[in-house]
Amino acid sequence: MSLTFSVSSLHPLYNYKPISTTTLPPKPRFLSIKSSLDDETQKQTSWVSPDWLTSLTRSLSLGRNDDSGIPIASAKLEDVSDLLGGALFLPLFKWMNDYGPIYRLAAGPRNFVIVSDPAIAKHVLKNYGIKYAKGLVAEVSEFLFGSGFAIAEGPLWTARRRAVVPSLHRKYLSVIVERVFCKCAERLVEKLQADALNGNAVNMEEKFSQLTLDVIGLSVFNYNFDSLTTDSPVIDAVYTALKEAEARSTDLLPYWKIDALCKIIPRQIKAAKAVMVIRQTVEELIEKCKKIVEIEGEKINEEEYVNDNDPSILRFLLASREEVSSVQLRDDLLSMLVAGHETTGSVLTWTLYLLSKDSSALMKAQEEVDRVLQGRPPTYDDIKDLKYLTRCINESLRLYPHPPVLIRRAQVADVLPGNYKVNAGQDIMISVYNIHHSSKRSLLSAVNLET
């Protein structure tokens, strides 16, 4: 079977235009890979500001009396084009090798401090909510997530997390694996059979995105999007919204904050329609479930509560009788729908891509699955016995973490480990990819899966 993998950065703020990688079957069972990540002819395009604006931003934001101790990356237009229109982690990694574990990058109208040092990353993340906030991520994504916990800050984030987490208990996971995960995976396998027999190329990123949307629809809402077999307007709407969020992070001016302009600019009209599709879908599912819960008079009477007919998270939250507005509930569930299905799809795509490049690892993973499952569908309890496959997934996450960068904004002036100074309002990119790939760190290698 031939597989076409999309191996772009897959970041929530990534400009979604897949880079394809095709695998051809040199012999039965195993796959060989030719990666287009190294193909210089397949660069994606994105609008970026000219070099003079980047230089001006660098001069104005830093001045001559910069005492931060942070080196400044000298990025040209072609470098910034790669950064904003291509795989985000690649140029950041290049500059880490040139300038070290922390450097400043002026990209058009913005400047970022890029962090690739674990101690500095820990400092920033540990002080989230005290000295640091989500900043830019929240600004460019609010139109989509509203007040959902994906971008919520402070007490609101704490309250919403406490409300949602209890629904993800062991009994729920066991039921969902059996009733949702397995059935959706079997449906994907059935759909791939014809392509396998005919030797057709398949975009597996697309298939995994459809698969995870179906899984999230059933496990969160008890709703079958059936995107594996039918065209789903929700998927198109999700990617349109994510693409808009990515574009907003690179706009010269945040004109999208002006309502009048959003009503006449085609890009904003398209984004607004996409968000409307997503929100209407979620709102309809909430109202439908609310009516059922009220009719049945359902209340949670045990810690690990699961409704036999509808084991979804939505059913749990409504049955808990928590005092929460419909809008807040919608935004929380929308966070799961949009962010959840894409992150999971990314892990599946990268893991399959890497296994397909290593026939011995693929064989060992297949042998473990055959030995543990003995031809039956998997259960939640089987996970602990699928040790090698779990290590393969973990290694995939190390090599291609999702997201590859985390963005935070300093709320107050701060001194980072190493005596680097940042001002209030400074946007910081923590490059998880760089940390995982730094030659100076003691990290497991891809060849060390045996241990």
Cite the ranges covered by each PLM segment:
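Hydrophobic mid-domain F-helix/FG-region of cytochrome P450s
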Residues: 109-122, 146, 186, 202-227, ...
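Cytochrome P450 core scaffold surrounding the K-helix E-X-X-R motif
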Residues: 121-126, 225-226, 360, 435-447
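N-terminal membrane-proximal hinge/A-helix region immediately C-terminal to the signal-anchor transmembrane segment
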Residues: 2-147, 152-159, 180-191, 226, ...
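Conserved cytochrome P450 catalytic core segment spanning the I/J/K helices
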Residues: 169-170, 175, 251, 271-348, ...
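Cytochrome P450 I-helix active-site segment
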Residues: 68-72, 178-182, 233-242, 276, ...
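Cytochrome P450
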Residues: 2-12, 106-113, 172-183, 193-218, ...
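Cytochrome P450 heme-binding Cys-pocket and its upstream "meander" loop
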Residues: 87-94, 320-331, 435-451
